[in-house]
Amino acid sequence: MLRRAELMAYETIIVDIEDHVCVITLNRPEALNALSKELLDELVEALEEGQNNDKVRCIVITGSEKAFAAGADIKMMQDKNFSEVFLEDLFTNQADRISRIRKPIIAAVSGY
């Protein structure tokens, strides 16, 4: 088992690797794990870390406490108008990078 101290340090997710499974836990319970830019950036980094780790055969994504993920964190958009949010295209780069992961990814969803 790899201990958390041996893995990259993250602010909004927790990563554990045990028995060839990388478990990524979304860890913003105060916001019901809403997807902020920071969380998505860290999620992509952790997924790519799992992809590049020969000991990892599968990646599981789950949420902390009572929610898997409440959706996009609209607080990061509150000071922008529709055009700014639409043209900024906040999540396309992360979604594209996630789509390139070739190891199986399982969403362990419970709650909201």
Residue ranges and their predicted role:
Residues 55, 63-97:
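Glycine- (often His-adjacent) and acidic-residue-rich active-site loop
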Residues 41, 89-90, 112:
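Residue-level recognition of alpha-helix initiation/capping sites
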Residues 2-64:
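Conserved CoA-thioester-binding segment of acyl-CoA-metabolizing enzymes
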